[in-house]
């Protein structure tokens, strides 16, 4: 009986440690660390769990797509691929600066950008996204869509209490061995379009 009283807590402790070590290697743990890094303004931790270069490139592509499809009459109807080739590299740098600046200071830079793809700047698009998520939508959690081939597809699920509608922001994460890293937001343009009517 005495051996059981000694061994049982050790087994429970070992199981808890094993669970934590496995959980640390799951995509949801990485998302918690991204939130923690954002709140604590910890750029090193943020960059461990978010590939800033890949995310910035993703945001730049989404911004061009959003501008060409929905917003800017000046460039609407033009070849989207030509517009993407012209503006995406510069926008990539702009978004990278914005993301890093936000992590360091907790706000988006007020300085404008020289990129003139639309009357709405990249900063305005991200601030609009933040405003909708913080003030108009309720966060319903993360859902894992698929894990395989070194990638995980997740959704950040939101709903609008005023309209009882749901909205999903799709995230792609890459398996880095001992942790997962966000590399893409794949439907930002559709997400922004879907929440504009709120």
Locations of the language-model features?
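Structured domain cores in non-transmembrane regions
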Residues: 57-115
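Alpha-helical transmembrane signal-anchor/signal-peptide segments
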Residues: 26-42
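Short extracytoplasmic
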Residues: 39-68
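Hydrophobic membrane-insertion alpha-helices, especially the h-region
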Residues: 4-24
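Exposed beta-sheet edge and beta->alpha loop/turn motif
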Residues: 92-198
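Short N-terminal edge-element motif at the start of the domain
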Residues: 18-26, 156, 174
């Amino acid at each position: 009986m005495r051996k059981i009283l000694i061994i049982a807590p050790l087994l429970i402790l070992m199981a808890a440690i094993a669970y934590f070590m496995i959980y640390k290697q799951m995509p949801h743990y990485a998302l918690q660390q991204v939130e923690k890094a954002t709140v604590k303004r910890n750029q090193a931790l943020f960059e461990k769990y978010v590939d800033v270069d890949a995310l910035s490139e993703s945001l730049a592509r989404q911004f061009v797509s959003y501008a060409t499809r929905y917003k800017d009459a000046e460039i609407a109807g033009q070849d989207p691929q030509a517009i993407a080739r012209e503006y995406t590299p510069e926008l990539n740098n702009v978004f990278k600066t914005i993301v890093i600046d936000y992590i360091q200071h907790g706000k988006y830079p007020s300085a404008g950008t020289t990129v003139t793809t639309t009357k709405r700047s990249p900063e305005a698009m991200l601030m609009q996204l933040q405003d909708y998520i913080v003030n108009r939508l309720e966060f319903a959690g993360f859902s894992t869509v698929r894990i395989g081939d070194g990638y995980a597809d997740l959704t950040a699920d939101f709903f609008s209490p005023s309209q009882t509608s749901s909205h999903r922001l799709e995230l792609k994460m890459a398996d880095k061995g001992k942790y997962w890293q966000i590399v893409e937001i794949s439907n930002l343009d559709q997400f922004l379009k879907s929440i504009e009517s709120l």
